[in-house]
Swiss-Prot record:
Cellular-component GO terms for this entry: plasma membrane; proton-transporting ATP synthase complex
Protein's name in the database: ATP synthase gamma chain
Protein's organism: Paenarthrobacter aurescens (strain TC1)
GO function terms (MF aspect): ATP binding; proton-transporting ATP synthase activity, rotational mechanism
Topology relative to the membrane: Peripheral membrane protein
InterPro entries with a match to the protein in the record: ATP_synth_F1_ATPase_gsu, ATP_synth_F1_gsu, ATP_synth_F1_gsu_CS
Keywords per UniProt: ATP synthesis, Cell membrane, CF(1), Hydrogen ion transport, Ion transport, Membrane, Transport
């Protein structure tokens, strides 16, 4: 009986230590979410401005730019999958990968090859475990992405988009990431990045109609300069949204783990007390039995 009590004490001690760790990680994630949301908000003015600029150029010109022209036949699609580097975030990465699997199945059903580009060690481990190939992978800092990483990703995707199919190029680019809606709601999302669909944002109201411009130098040169910046901004925005979603998911997961640890501590405490009472009862019974034996 005494050994059983010691086991419960050890379980209570270890679970209490784990609860402290969960609480610390929850507080860290909570503090970082505010910074992540602020970065998302800070990126919006630039993203909106460059989106308006690209829309103005593309809608007011009749040129066939490679990044805005729909190919006659789409044979290979690139899929950029943004996950996390670390775990302890609930089903965050699993949800993104499930969404990516659904997109991959859809593209295969349309007769398209799929070329994967991965962000985050979770996506890399997922593909490695299944012996599936991928073109590129970027790891490190998924919960605090840097614009330089988005530039590198954008450059790699644009390079393959500009390459012929026979040389391993792609005809369209999709991005799978988690959109941050609120602290309790994050939604796995798919967007098609290229070829650029000019009318892909919500329709502007009459007061927001784009004015007419005359472009210097030529419109094609303006697009050549703007579109890479536009692609980088869209990728960076997706990475920032994913980072905020990852931290929110981790905060919820750690809170849930802490609550479960509290329940376990209560359970083990109750079992320990029951075992202690049983031990005391047994000792009293032995004392009474011994006294009766002496009296007789």
């Amino acid at each position: 009986m005494g050994a059983q009590i010691r086991v419960y004490r050890q379980k209570i001690s270890s679970t209490t230590s784990m609860r402290k760790i969960f609480k610390a990680m929850e507080l860290i994630a909570t503090s970082r979410i505010g910074k992540a949301r602020a970065r998302v908000a800070a990126s919006l003015p630039y993203a909106n401005a460059i989106t308006r600029a690209v829309s103005a150029v593309a809608t007011q010109s009749e040129i066939d730019h490679p990044l805005t022209t729909e190919p006659e036949q789409i044979r290979r699609a690139a899929v950029l999958i943004i996950t996390s580097d670390r775990g302890l975030a609930g089903s965050y990465s699993a949800s993104v990968l499930k969404q990516a699997e659904g997109l991959t199945e859809l593209l295969h059903a349309e007769g398209k090859e799929v070329k994967a580009y991965l962000v985050g060690r979770k996506a890399q481990a997922y593909f490695d475990f299944r012996n599936r190939s991928y073109a590129r992978v970027w790891t490190g800092g998924t919960d605090a992405p840097e614009f330089e990483t988005a530039q590198e990703v954008g450059a790699a995707l644009l390079e393959d988009f500009s390459t012929d199919f026979e040389e391993g190029g792609v005809d369209e680019i999709h991005v799978v990431y988690t959109r941050f809606k609120s602290m309790v709601t994050q939604e796995p999302t798919v967007i098609r990045l290229l070829p650029l669909e000019v009318v892909e944002e919500e329709a502007a109201s009459e007061s927001e109609l784009l004015p007419l411009y005359e472009f210097e130098p030529e419109t094609e040169q303006v697009l050549d300069a703007l579109l890479p910046r536009y692609i980088e901004s869209r990728i960076f925005a997706a990475m920032l949204q994913a980072a905020a979603s990852e931290l929110a998911a981790r905060q919820r997961a750690m809170k849930s783990a802490g609550d479960n640890a509290t329940d376990l501590i209560k359970k083990y405490t109750r079992l320990r007390n029951t075992a202690r009472q049983a031990e005391i009862t047994q000792e009293l019974s032995e004392i009474v039995a011994g006294a009766d034996a002496l009296a007789s």
